[in-house]
């Protein structure tokens, strides 16, 4: 689990989350939109940890209180990750894991937070079931949907959520992070960041992938090698 200061970029989003934690005024339903690997899940986890943090400090999550330690180990009883066993997230899974348990008050925290990654995988029936829950949630209930394809979600779902747009980071920021955390040569960090186009998750995978390095070298060779036509021209005798 990261603190807000350890998460790269997304400064405005982090400021909004920290204000919601500080003022104790989170929205009841969030929709985190952005491509896979851009940082949605990392910030969702940190946001949930900060909301549940028991520290008196303004710098939350503290990583030291009981709740933060539970978050670190994945055992915080009032932060629930909604999972699926099949390609889609069906109505029965949404009802069993979220809708039917929302009315049960938090066990030991101020909020009951549900995190739904890949929310675009929800069937229409599942979305309609969720809609009824987020239309009239209990005071302590918070749902955070994460998606890389917002158009797959019903307009009624979108309209009842606070949409948070996760945009690509600058190539320089991604390159610096990869260089520091992946311990790769400068040229490899630079190439990984360039090919990732601002997606930190992709850049990290590229930096650690031997297959990517080989493909990148092959592509660079194709661009730098002379074409057959150029080679033919180079062999032609120059005119007197």
Where are each of the predicted segments found?
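Clamp-loader machinery-focused feature within the broader ASCE/P-loop NTPase space
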Residues: 1-125
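Charged, glycine-rich active-site and insertion segments that engage polyanionic ligands
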Residues: 1-50, 70, 139-140, 149-225, ...
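Conserved adenine-binding aromatic site and its adjacent loop/helix in ATP-hydrolyzing domains
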Residues: 100, 132, 155, 159
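Loop/turn-to-beta-strand initiation segments
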Residues: 110-113, 139-143
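A short beta-strand-to-loop transition that corresponds to the Sensor-1 phosphate-sensing loop
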Residues: 118, 146-150
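Residues immediately C-terminal
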Residues: 121, 136, 152
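Conserved catalytic/switch belt of AAA+ P-loop NTPases
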Residues: 128-139
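Positively charged, low-complexity/disordered segments
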Residues: 228-230, 234-240
């Amino acid at each position: 689990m990261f603190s807000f200061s350890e998460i790269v970029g997304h400064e405005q989003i982090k400021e909004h989350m920290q204000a919601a934690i500080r003022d104790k005024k989170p929205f009841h339903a969030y929709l985190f939109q952005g491509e896979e690997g851009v940082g949605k899940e990392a910030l969702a986890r940190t946001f949930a940890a900060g909301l549940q943090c028991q520290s008196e400090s303004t710098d939350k999550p503290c990583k030291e209180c009981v709740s933060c330690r539970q978050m670190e180990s994945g055992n915080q009883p009032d932060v629930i990750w909604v999972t699926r066993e099949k390609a889609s997230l069906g109505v029965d899974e949404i009802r069993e894991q979220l809708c039917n348990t929302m009315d049960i008050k938090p066990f030991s925290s101020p909020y009951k937070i549900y995190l739904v990654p890949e929310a675009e995988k929800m069937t229409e029936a599942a979305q309609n079931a969720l809609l009824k829950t987020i239309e009239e949630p209990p005071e302590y209930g918070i749902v955070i949907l994460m998606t890389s394809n917002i158009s797959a979600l019903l307009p009624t779902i979108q309209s009842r959520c606070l949409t948070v747009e996760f945009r690509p980071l600058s190539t320089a920021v991604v390159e610096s992070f990869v260089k520091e955390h992946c311990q790769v040569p400068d040229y490899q960090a630079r190439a990984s960041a360039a090919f990732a186009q601002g997606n930190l998750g992709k850049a990290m995978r590229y930096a650690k992938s031997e297959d990517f390095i080989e493909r990148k070298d092959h592509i660079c060779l194709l661009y730098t090698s002379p074409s057959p036509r150029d080679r033919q021209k180079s062999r032609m005798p120059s005119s007197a």
